[in-house]
Amino acid sequence: MTNLNFRLAQFADIPQLVDLINKSYREQQGRSWTTELEFVKGQRITELQLKEQLQLSNSTLLVGESNSSKIVACIGLTFENNQVEVGTFCTDPDVQNMRVGRSVLEYAEQYALKEVPHLTNAVMYVLDVRSELIAYYERRGYVKTGNEQSYPVEANVGVPIKLIEMKKDLK
């Protein structure tokens, strides 16, 4: 399933996106290889948080739709000087391992360069305990920078985990 239609997220998409993001990150323990359920509890995002994200002037949320117009993936881009931060990236667990994630990430990188031609790199932050996800991003050209930050304490995750920075040259 690599035939996706990409577009900018709209406010009307918020309920469907909140369901998709929370399903991808916090549910589907047996099915999804991207779930954070055993490491992080609670919702990944709320409707209010997503609405606030969509209103940021330096931020874009792209969605990938199947041929039936169902949103099956999303990815967020936050532009800062010559860098774009990639986040809020997920695919519906039902379409994982079908190259959807790869297509979405490639499209997002190309979109970012088209929107801001002077970009030099993309950066993302990944849970240090997610070795399979880190390996996935390494296969996509991202490298660990050595920079780490503690996972937000207010997230009340219980287990001390870190976010590691990964970066990819876009030029």
Locate predicted features.
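A short helix-loop-beta-strand connector motif used in the catalytic cores of GNAT acetyltransferases and
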Residues: 43-63
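Conserved glycine-rich acetyl-CoA-binding loop
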Residues: 70, 92-106, 128-135, 139
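Conserved beta-strand in the GNAT
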Residues: 63, 70-78, 85-90
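Conserved N-terminal entry element of GNAT/NAT acetyltransferase domains
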Residues: 1-15, 168-171
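C-terminal "cap" of GNAT-fold acetyltransferases
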Residues: 118-171
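Conserved acyl-CoA
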Residues: 103-121
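Conserved GNAT-fold acetyl-CoA-binding loop/helix
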Residues: 22-50
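Residue-level recognition of the GNAT/N-acetyltransferase active site
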Residues: 10, 78, 87, 92, ...
